[in-house]
């Protein structure tokens, strides 16, 4: 059973603070191993990829190509149930339409003395998309990463995916085709991240790597950062639901379990001002757990990291929500807009009782790649902005240079940078 906390209790702050800092990921010191793998790929290229793919995934690249062929992608698309294809296509259309609204515009202007200033946006040239294998291989995540990159104008999107024995989940390949991703390699782990960052004989390097993975992938992304950009280091999923008494406990229980079934380290939290509702939701969770195919995972998540928090009034939930900074925040209350106006920290907000977080996972149009582990305090979910970069523009004519030069020269001299000062003064006094 999840922990029960009451805001009115004398020891609430102590218990809540401890709850916030509970570690939900198994700590695995893989940095040394990952460093060795990255160095091996940098030095041996394809040979290293073949070695690790054989060792970890049982793939023999003398029997199957490293790159997934166009025929394989087409065959996978044909093999996937038509209803799934149509759902993926609907999701892709909605993601594309929403993310197109995020495209920033160039802003070039002239100030009051005639200096041209502004910024210009350009797409990153090449992006690598890591797609996990196994039970965490989600076609929807392919769309959430690839479609915004396409909208941004990224010319080359490279997908890597672990393939046990060489086989890739057909739905993942179908999603890639729908998103317009054609360059796909059946490699995974730290070795795939290294190949994307540094390149091999077969794989040209990219400029940025996005997508979640296990501890080895996360460590590899950390280690190659600086050589390439990365999106974020994703942790276990989480949801916070703020609910008043006028809710169906079964609805709320289903929402909490939708996160809990992801991972034993996932976290589901309910904050309510009604004790009876809190107890009813707890009971509903226990009933619904018996219906789930992933009940063992969900039960462990709920027991180890779940919480029901009772507050005296709904506005008391606001500071708690901002401290939790949840990946997903549902506002299942009569006036969700009033609460939302005061929420500063959340990866995504789902407004009203009829907006389950799961719609955002799939077909809402918003992105489901969101900051976890309280990182919504300082970061945002994946968007078009992750695939573009801003370049500053500055333009002066002779008159503008004459007006600004004295101050620039003064500051350069004050910092002891004579060449800086001369770079300006030589344009005013060519003989100097």
Curated annotation (Swiss-Prot):
- For this protein, what reaction is catalysed? L-histidinol + 2 NAD(+) + H2O = L-histidine + 2 NADH + 3 H(+)
**Active site positions:** 327 (proton acceptor), 328 (proton acceptor)
Pathway of this protein?
A: Amino-acid biosynthesis; L-histidine biosynthesis; L-histidine from 5-phospho-alpha-D-ribose 1-diphosphate: step 9/9
- Protein keywords: Amino-acid biosynthesis, Histidine biosynthesis, Metal-binding, NAD, Oxidoreductase, Zinc
The residue ranges crossing the membrane are none
Q: Where does Zn(2+) bind?
A: 259, 262, 361, 420
How is the cofactor bound, in the record's words?
A: Binds 1 zinc ion per subunit.
Per the entry, which co-factors are needed? Zn(2+)
EC supergroup of this enzyme? oxidoreductase
GO BP terms: L-histidine biosynthetic process
Q: Which family does the entry's similarity section mention?
A: Belongs to the histidinol dehydrogenase family.
Quote any Pfam family the record assigns. Answer: Histidinol_dh
Give binding positions for substrate: 237, 259, 262, 328, 361, 415, 420
Report the protein's function: Catalyzes the sequential NAD-dependent oxidations of L-histidinol to L-histidinaldehyde and then to L-histidine.
- GO MF annotation terms: histidinol dehydrogenase activity; NAD binding; zinc ion binding
The UniProt entry, under PANTHER family, shows:
HISTIDINE BIOSYNTHESIS TRIFUNCTIONAL PROTEIN, HISTIDINOL DEHYDROGENASE HDH
State which Enzyme Commission number(s) the record gives. Answer: 1.1.1.23
Q: At which positions is NAD(+) bound? A: 130, 191, 214
Q: Which GO terms describe its cellular component?
A: cytosol
What protein name does the entry list?
Answer: Histidinol dehydrogenase
């Amino acid at each position: 059973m999840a922990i029960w906390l009451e805001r009115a209790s004398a020891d609430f702050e102590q218990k809540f603070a401890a709850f916030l800092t509970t570690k939900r990921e198994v700590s695995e010191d893989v940095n040394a191993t990952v460093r060795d793998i990255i160095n091996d790929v940098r030095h041996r290229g394809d040979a290293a990829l073949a070695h690790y793919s054989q060792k970890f995934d049982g793939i023999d690249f003398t029997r199957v190509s490293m790159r997934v062929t166009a025929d394989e992608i087409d065959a996978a698309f044909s093999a996937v149930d038509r209803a799934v294809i149509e759902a993926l296509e609907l999701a892709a259309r909605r993601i594309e339409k929403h993310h197109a609204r995020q495209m920033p515009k160039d802003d070039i202007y002239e100030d009051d003395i005639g200096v041209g200033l502004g910024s210009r946006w350009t797409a990153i040239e090449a992006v690598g998309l890591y797609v996990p294998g196994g039970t965490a291989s989600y076609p929807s995540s392919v769309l959430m990463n690839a479609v915004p990159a396409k909208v941004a104008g990224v010319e080359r999107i490279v997908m890597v995916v672990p393939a046990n024995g060489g086989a890739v989940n057909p739905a993942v390949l179908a999603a890639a085709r729908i998103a317009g991703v054609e360059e796909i390699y059946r490699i995974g782990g730290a070795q795939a991240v290294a190949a994307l960052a540094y390149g091999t004989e077969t794989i040209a390097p990219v400029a940025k790597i996005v997508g979640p993975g296990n501890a080895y992938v996360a460590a590899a992304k950390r280690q190659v950062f600086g050589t390439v950009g990365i999106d974020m280091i994703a942790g276990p999923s989480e949801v916070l639901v703020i609910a008043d008494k006028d809710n169906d406990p079964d609805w709320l229980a289903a929402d909490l379990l939708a996160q809990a079934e992801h991972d034993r380290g996932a976290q589901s939290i309910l904050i309510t001002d009604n004790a009876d509702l809190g107890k009813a939701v707890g009971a509903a969770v226990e009933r619904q757990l018996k219906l789930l195919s992933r009940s063992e995972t969900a039960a462990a998540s709920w027991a180890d990291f779940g919480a029901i928090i009772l507050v005296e009034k709904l506005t008391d939930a606001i500071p708690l929500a901002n401290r939790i900074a949840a990946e997903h925040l549902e506002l299942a209350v009569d006036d969700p807009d009033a609460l939302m106006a005061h929420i500063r920290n959340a990866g995504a907000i789902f407004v009203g009782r009829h907006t389950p977080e799961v719609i955002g996972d799939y077909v809402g149009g918003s992105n489901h790649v969101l900051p976890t582990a309280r990182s919504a305090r300082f970061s945002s979910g994946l968007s078009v902005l992750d695939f573009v970069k801003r370049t500053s523009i500055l333009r002066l004519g002779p008159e503008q240079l004459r007006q600004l030069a004295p101050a620039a020269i003064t500051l350069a001299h004050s910092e002891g940078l004579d060449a800086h000062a001369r770079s300006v003064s030589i344009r005013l006094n060519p003989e100097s």
